[in-house]
Amino acid sequence: MLSIKVDERKPFDISLRNFKRACEKAGIKQELRDRQHYVKPTEKRKIAKRQAVKRARISQRRAFI
């Protein structure tokens, strides 16, 4: 569970920004996006393979330049 200490002397905006940053670090937003719908394991592997190929192409381009 994510918790943020709110200091009454500081503005609310700063506490909200700290909360958003903590959520980003914890990966809550990404996890919610991933859990919106079920993805079969075979589909996960296909996506992972596609991403690996894409990363390899990008790294080849960078190495060539």
Curated annotation (Swiss-Prot):
Cellular component terms per the entry's GO annotation: ribonucleoprotein complex; ribosome
Any one of the GO BP annotations: translation
Source organism superkingdom: Bacteria
GO molecular function: structural constituent of ribosome
Keywords: Ribonucleoprotein, Ribosomal protein
Family: Belongs to the bacterial ribosomal protein bS21 family.
Protein name: Small ribosomal subunit protein bS21A
Organism: Francisella tularensis subsp. tularensis (strain SCHU S4 / Schu 4)
